[in-house]
C-alpha cells in the first residue's frame, strides 16, 4: 500500500512541476 502512495505522490509532484514550467513559459512570451 505504501508503494502506491509514494508513486501517487511522485506523479503529483511531476505534474505540478511540468504545469508550473508551462506557466513560466507562457509568462515569458508576454
From Swiss-Prot:
UniProt-annotated location(s): Secreted
Q: Which domain of life is it from?
A: Eukaryota
Q: What is this protein's tissue specificity according to the annotation?
A: Expressed in venom sac and, to a lesser extent, in venom gland. Not expressed in brain.
Whether Repeat counts among this entry's keywords is no
**Signal peptide segment:** 1-17
* Primary location group: secreted
What is a single cellular component term in the Gene Ontology annotation? extracellular region
Record keywords: Secreted, Signal
Question: What binding partners and quaternary form does the record give?
Answer: Monomer.
- What is the protein name stated in its UniProt record? Ampulexin 3
Q: Which organism is it from?
A: Ampulex compressa
Amino acid at each position: 500500500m505504501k508503494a502506491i502512495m509514494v508513486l501517487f505522490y511522485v506523479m503529483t509532484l511531476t505534474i505540478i512541476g511540468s504545469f508550473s514550467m508551462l506557466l513560466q513559459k507562457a509568462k515569458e512570451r508576454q
